[in-house]
A protein has these predicted regions:
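Bacterial N-terminal signal peptides
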Residues: 9-22
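Boundary at the C-terminal end of the N-terminal hydrophobic targeting segment
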Residues: 25-27
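Metallo-beta-lactamase
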Residues: 31, 49, 133-167, 171-173, ...
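Conserved beta-strand hairpin/beta-sheet module of binuclear metal-dependent hydrolase folds
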Residues: 47-96, 175-179, 184-187
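Active-site HxH/HxHxD metal-binding segment of metal-dependent hydrolases
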Residues: 88, 95-156
Length: 301
Protein backbone atom coordinates (compact mmCIF):
# COMPACT_ATOMS: atom_id res chain seq x y z
CA UNK A 1 0.00 0.00 0.00
CA UNK A 2 1.35 3.40 -0.98
CA UNK A 3 1.80 6.16 1.58
CA UNK A 4 -1.03 8.10 -0.07
CA UNK A 5 -3.39 5.08 0.05
CA UNK A 6 -2.52 4.44 3.69
CA UNK A 7 -3.26 8.06 4.52
CA UNK A 8 -6.64 7.85 2.79
CA UNK A 9 -7.53 4.66 4.69
CA UNK A 10 -6.50 6.26 8.00
CA UNK A 11 -8.59 9.34 7.24
CA UNK A 12 -11.59 7.17 6.39
CA UNK A 13 -11.30 5.14 9.60
CA UNK A 14 -10.85 8.30 11.67
CA UNK A 15 -13.90 9.88 10.06
CA UNK A 16 -16.02 6.80 10.80
CA UNK A 17 -14.82 6.75 14.39
CA UNK A 18 -15.73 10.40 14.85
CA UNK A 19 -19.20 9.72 13.46
CA UNK A 20 -19.66 6.86 15.93
CA UNK A 21 -18.45 9.04 18.79
CA UNK A 22 -21.01 11.68 17.87
CA UNK A 23 -23.91 9.22 18.11
CA UNK A 24 -25.31 9.37 21.65
CA UNK A 25 -25.20 6.12 23.60
CA UNK A 26 -28.69 4.92 24.49
CA UNK A 27 -29.48 5.80 28.07
CA UNK A 28 -29.94 2.95 30.50
CA UNK A 29 -33.66 2.30 30.92
CA UNK A 30 -34.61 3.17 34.49
CA UNK A 31 -37.01 0.52 35.66
CA UNK A 32 -37.29 -2.37 38.11
CA UNK A 33 -38.65 -4.66 35.36
CA UNK A 34 -35.76 -6.94 34.34
CA UNK A 35 -36.97 -7.49 30.78
CA UNK A 36 -37.33 -3.74 30.17
CA UNK A 37 -33.82 -3.31 31.51
CA UNK A 38 -32.59 -5.82 28.94
CA UNK A 39 -32.09 -8.79 31.26
CA UNK A 40 -33.17 -12.40 31.05
CA UNK A 41 -33.88 -14.57 34.09
CA UNK A 42 -30.75 -16.53 33.23
CA UNK A 43 -28.68 -13.38 33.86
CA UNK A 44 -29.31 -13.77 37.60
CA UNK A 45 -27.93 -13.86 40.16
CA UNK A 46 -25.59 -10.94 39.41
CA UNK A 47 -22.62 -9.88 41.49
CA UNK A 48 -21.75 -6.22 40.88
CA UNK A 49 -18.35 -4.93 41.96
CA UNK A 50 -18.85 -1.55 43.63
CA UNK A 51 -15.27 -0.97 44.81
CA UNK A 52 -12.26 -3.07 45.73
CA UNK A 53 -13.58 -5.86 47.97
CA UNK A 54 -17.12 -4.40 48.01
CA UNK A 55 -19.92 -6.07 46.05
CA UNK A 56 -23.62 -5.75 45.42
CA UNK A 57 -25.63 -8.89 44.78
CA UNK A 58 -28.91 -8.99 42.84
CA UNK A 59 -31.20 -11.98 42.52
CA UNK A 60 -34.72 -12.31 41.17
CA UNK A 61 -37.56 -13.02 43.59
CA UNK A 62 -41.27 -13.43 43.05
CA UNK A 63 -43.09 -11.68 41.44
CA UNK A 64 -40.12 -10.94 39.20
CA UNK A 65 -37.94 -8.15 40.57
CA UNK A 66 -34.64 -8.08 42.41
CA UNK A 67 -33.66 -8.36 46.03
CA UNK A 68 -30.28 -6.72 46.63
CA UNK A 69 -27.66 -7.66 49.21
CA UNK A 70 -24.21 -6.25 49.96
CA UNK A 71 -21.04 -8.08 50.91
CA UNK A 72 -17.62 -6.80 51.92
CA UNK A 73 -14.48 -8.94 51.82
CA UNK A 74 -11.93 -8.08 54.49
CA UNK A 75 -8.51 -9.54 55.25
CA UNK A 76 -9.92 -12.26 57.47
CA UNK A 77 -13.63 -12.51 56.79
CA UNK A 78 -16.78 -11.38 55.01
CA UNK A 79 -19.56 -9.03 56.08
CA UNK A 80 -23.03 -9.44 54.59
CA UNK A 81 -25.72 -6.78 54.75
CA UNK A 82 -29.15 -8.32 54.12
CA UNK A 83 -29.61 -11.84 52.89
CA UNK A 84 -32.14 -13.32 50.50
CA UNK A 85 -35.71 -14.50 50.82
CA UNK A 86 -35.39 -18.28 51.12
CA UNK A 87 -32.90 -20.93 52.15
CA UNK A 88 -32.45 -21.85 48.49
CA UNK A 89 -31.79 -18.23 47.48
CA UNK A 90 -29.39 -17.73 50.39
CA UNK A 91 -27.51 -20.90 49.50
CA UNK A 92 -27.11 -19.55 45.99
CA UNK A 93 -25.84 -16.22 47.33
CA UNK A 94 -23.29 -17.88 49.62
CA UNK A 95 -22.14 -19.91 46.62
CA UNK A 96 -21.59 -16.75 44.61
CA UNK A 97 -19.65 -15.18 47.49
CA UNK A 98 -17.48 -18.32 47.58
CA UNK A 99 -16.54 -17.64 43.95
CA UNK A 100 -15.08 -14.30 45.09
CA UNK A 101 -13.41 -15.42 48.32
CA UNK A 102 -12.93 -18.50 50.48
CA UNK A 103 -12.99 -16.39 53.66
CA UNK A 104 -15.76 -17.10 56.17
CA UNK A 105 -18.80 -14.94 56.81
CA UNK A 106 -18.15 -13.25 60.17
CA UNK A 107 -20.63 -10.36 60.31
CA UNK A 108 -24.26 -9.91 59.26
CA UNK A 109 -26.07 -6.56 59.29
CA UNK A 110 -29.87 -6.67 59.45
CA UNK A 111 -30.79 -3.82 57.12
CA UNK A 112 -34.38 -5.05 56.88
CA UNK A 113 -36.01 -7.58 59.17
CA UNK A 114 -38.54 -8.61 56.52
CA UNK A 115 -38.57 -12.20 55.34
CA UNK A 116 -37.52 -11.42 51.79
CA UNK A 117 -34.14 -10.41 53.26
CA UNK A 118 -33.85 -12.80 56.21
CA UNK A 119 -35.61 -16.10 55.41
CA UNK A 120 -32.35 -17.79 54.47
CA UNK A 121 -30.39 -16.69 57.52
CA UNK A 122 -30.40 -20.17 59.02
CA UNK A 123 -27.49 -20.87 56.65
CA UNK A 124 -25.27 -18.27 58.30
CA UNK A 125 -22.44 -19.63 60.46
CA UNK A 126 -23.58 -20.19 64.06
CA UNK A 127 -20.85 -17.85 65.34
CA UNK A 128 -21.70 -14.98 62.99
CA UNK A 129 -21.86 -11.55 64.66
CA UNK A 130 -25.20 -9.84 64.11
CA UNK A 131 -25.57 -6.07 63.89
CA UNK A 132 -29.23 -5.26 64.51
CA UNK A 133 -31.46 -2.58 66.00
CA UNK A 134 -33.51 -3.38 69.11
CA UNK A 135 -36.68 -3.21 67.00
CA UNK A 136 -35.46 -5.73 64.42
CA UNK A 137 -33.99 -7.96 67.10
CA UNK A 138 -37.49 -8.23 68.56
CA UNK A 139 -39.06 -8.88 65.17
CA UNK A 140 -36.60 -11.68 64.41
CA UNK A 141 -36.43 -12.99 67.99
CA UNK A 142 -32.64 -13.00 67.90
CA UNK A 143 -30.60 -13.79 70.99
CA UNK A 144 -27.73 -11.62 69.74
CA UNK A 145 -27.24 -8.25 71.48
CA UNK A 146 -28.76 -5.22 69.77
CA UNK A 147 -26.99 -1.98 68.90
CA UNK A 148 -26.66 0.34 71.88
CA UNK A 149 -27.03 3.54 69.84
CA UNK A 150 -27.64 4.78 66.31
CA UNK A 151 -24.19 3.86 64.94
CA UNK A 152 -21.93 0.83 65.09
CA UNK A 153 -18.54 0.71 63.39
CA UNK A 154 -17.23 -2.64 62.17
CA UNK A 155 -13.62 -3.14 61.08
CA UNK A 156 -13.95 -5.71 58.33
CA UNK A 157 -10.30 -6.68 58.10
CA UNK A 158 -9.10 -3.19 57.23
CA UNK A 159 -12.32 -1.84 55.71
CA UNK A 160 -14.44 0.51 57.82
CA UNK A 161 -18.14 -0.27 57.69
CA UNK A 162 -20.72 1.77 59.60
CA UNK A 163 -24.20 0.49 60.43
CA UNK A 164 -26.39 3.58 60.81
CA UNK A 165 -29.90 3.93 62.18
CA UNK A 166 -31.26 7.11 60.59
CA UNK A 167 -34.80 6.65 61.88
CA UNK A 168 -37.97 4.73 61.10
CA UNK A 169 -38.71 4.35 57.41
CA UNK A 170 -39.76 1.14 55.64
CA UNK A 171 -39.84 -0.54 59.06
CA UNK A 172 -39.26 0.50 62.64
CA UNK A 173 -35.68 -0.76 62.63
CA UNK A 174 -34.07 -0.03 59.26
CA UNK A 175 -30.28 0.08 59.13
CA UNK A 176 -28.26 1.56 56.28
CA UNK A 177 -24.66 0.54 55.70
CA UNK A 178 -22.06 3.22 55.04
CA UNK A 179 -18.54 2.75 53.73
CA UNK A 180 -17.02 6.22 54.21
CA UNK A 181 -13.78 5.64 52.29
CA UNK A 182 -15.58 4.13 49.30
CA UNK A 183 -18.48 6.61 49.62
CA UNK A 184 -21.04 3.83 49.24
CA UNK A 185 -24.34 3.67 51.13
CA UNK A 186 -26.32 0.44 51.03
CA UNK A 187 -29.84 1.51 51.93
CA UNK A 188 -31.64 -1.81 52.21
CA UNK A 189 -35.40 -1.26 51.99
CA UNK A 190 -35.15 2.44 52.71
CA UNK A 191 -34.58 2.72 48.93
CA UNK A 192 -36.67 0.63 46.53
CA UNK A 193 -35.41 1.64 43.11
CA UNK A 194 -38.41 2.11 40.79
CA UNK A 195 -40.54 -0.12 43.01
CA UNK A 196 -43.76 1.47 44.30
CA UNK A 197 -43.38 2.48 47.98
CA UNK A 198 -44.11 -0.61 50.06
CA UNK A 199 -45.68 0.59 53.30
CA UNK A 200 -46.96 -2.49 55.13
CA UNK A 201 -44.64 -1.78 58.08
CA UNK A 202 -43.76 1.81 57.20
CA UNK A 203 -43.73 5.24 58.78
CA UNK A 204 -44.44 7.30 55.65
CA UNK A 205 -43.52 10.85 56.64
CA UNK A 206 -40.55 9.72 58.75
CA UNK A 207 -39.34 7.73 55.75
CA UNK A 208 -39.05 10.93 53.72
CA UNK A 209 -36.93 12.44 56.50
CA UNK A 210 -34.62 9.42 56.64
CA UNK A 211 -33.85 9.86 52.95
CA UNK A 212 -33.05 13.53 53.62
CA UNK A 213 -30.45 12.37 56.15
CA UNK A 214 -29.00 9.85 53.69
CA UNK A 215 -28.66 12.47 50.97
CA UNK A 216 -26.61 14.66 53.32
CA UNK A 217 -23.95 11.98 53.82
CA UNK A 218 -20.77 12.03 51.74
CA UNK A 219 -21.91 9.36 49.29
CA UNK A 220 -21.15 8.73 45.64
CA UNK A 221 -23.27 5.61 45.19
CA UNK A 222 -26.57 4.69 46.82
CA UNK A 223 -27.44 0.99 46.63
CA UNK A 224 -31.12 -0.04 46.92
CA UNK A 225 -32.65 -3.04 48.66
CA UNK A 226 -34.84 -3.78 45.63
CA UNK A 227 -34.59 -2.72 42.01
CA UNK A 228 -31.31 -2.41 40.17
CA UNK A 229 -27.93 -1.11 41.30
CA UNK A 230 -27.21 2.07 39.36
CA UNK A 231 -24.02 3.89 38.44
CA UNK A 232 -23.14 6.64 40.96
CA UNK A 233 -24.78 9.65 39.29
CA UNK A 234 -27.94 7.73 38.43
CA UNK A 235 -28.11 6.25 41.93
CA UNK A 236 -28.44 9.71 43.50
CA UNK A 237 -30.99 10.76 40.90
CA UNK A 238 -33.04 7.63 41.53
CA UNK A 239 -32.95 8.03 45.30
CA UNK A 240 -34.23 11.59 44.89
CA UNK A 241 -36.92 10.27 42.54
CA UNK A 242 -37.88 7.66 45.10
CA UNK A 243 -38.26 10.33 47.75
CA UNK A 244 -40.48 12.26 45.31
CA UNK A 245 -42.59 9.12 44.93
CA UNK A 246 -43.02 8.88 48.70
CA UNK A 247 -44.05 12.53 48.88
CA UNK A 248 -46.45 12.11 45.96
CA UNK A 249 -48.12 9.08 47.56
CA UNK A 250 -48.50 10.87 50.89
CA UNK A 251 -49.92 13.99 49.20
CA UNK A 252 -52.41 12.04 47.07
CA UNK A 253 -53.67 10.02 50.03
CA UNK A 254 -54.03 13.17 52.11
CA UNK A 255 -56.11 14.69 49.30
CA UNK A 256 -58.42 11.68 49.24
CA UNK A 257 -58.69 11.61 53.03
CA UNK A 258 -59.65 15.30 53.08
CA UNK A 259 -62.32 14.52 50.48
CA UNK A 260 -63.92 12.19 53.01
CA UNK A 261 -63.28 8.93 51.20
CA UNK A 262 -62.86 5.65 53.01
CA UNK A 263 -59.49 3.97 52.62
CA UNK A 264 -61.09 1.36 50.36
CA UNK A 265 -62.63 3.97 48.05
CA UNK A 266 -59.46 6.06 48.13
CA UNK A 267 -57.43 3.10 46.92
CA UNK A 268 -59.76 2.75 43.93
CA UNK A 269 -59.62 6.45 43.04
CA UNK A 270 -55.96 7.22 43.76
CA UNK A 271 -54.02 8.84 40.93
CA UNK A 272 -50.38 7.89 41.30
CA UNK A 273 -49.24 9.94 38.32
CA UNK A 274 -45.96 8.67 36.81
CA UNK A 275 -45.55 6.16 39.64
CA UNK A 276 -48.44 4.08 38.32
CA UNK A 277 -45.84 2.54 35.99
CA UNK A 278 -43.64 1.32 38.83
CA UNK A 279 -43.29 -2.30 39.88
CA UNK A 280 -45.85 -3.56 42.47
CA UNK A 281 -48.20 -0.57 42.13
CA UNK A 282 -51.30 -2.81 41.99
CA UNK A 283 -50.32 -4.67 45.14
CA UNK A 284 -48.74 -1.85 47.13
CA UNK A 285 -51.01 1.08 46.22
CA UNK A 286 -53.92 0.01 48.47
CA UNK A 287 -51.51 -0.85 51.30
CA UNK A 288 -49.96 2.61 51.05
CA UNK A 289 -53.40 4.20 51.27
CA UNK A 290 -54.23 2.32 54.45
CA UNK A 291 -50.89 3.13 56.05
CA UNK A 292 -51.07 6.86 55.27
CA UNK A 293 -54.65 6.90 56.59
CA UNK A 294 -53.32 5.41 59.84
CA UNK A 295 -50.69 8.15 60.00
CA UNK A 296 -53.21 10.92 59.32
CA UNK A 297 -55.59 9.58 61.95
CA UNK A 298 -52.90 9.16 64.60
CA UNK A 299 -53.17 5.37 64.63
CA UNK A 300 -49.58 4.68 63.59
CA UNK A 301 -47.60 3.21 66.48
Amino acid sequence: MSARSAALVFASVLSAALVLMSVPVAAQVRTAFPEKRGFKLTDFPRTVKLADNVYGYEDIRQPGFTTVSLFVVGNDGVLIADGQGSVEAMKKMLGEIAKVTSKPVKWYIVGSDHGDHTAGNSLLPPDVTYVVTPFSKGQLKLSAPAMAGDKQVINVGGIEVQALYLGRAHTGGDLVVYLPKQKILFMSEVFLNRVFPAMRSAYPTEWVGVIDKALKLDVDRFVPGHGFIEEPKASREELIEYQKALRAVIAEVNRLHQAGLSAEDAAKQADWGPYKEWFLVEQQGPIAVRKVYEEIEGKLK
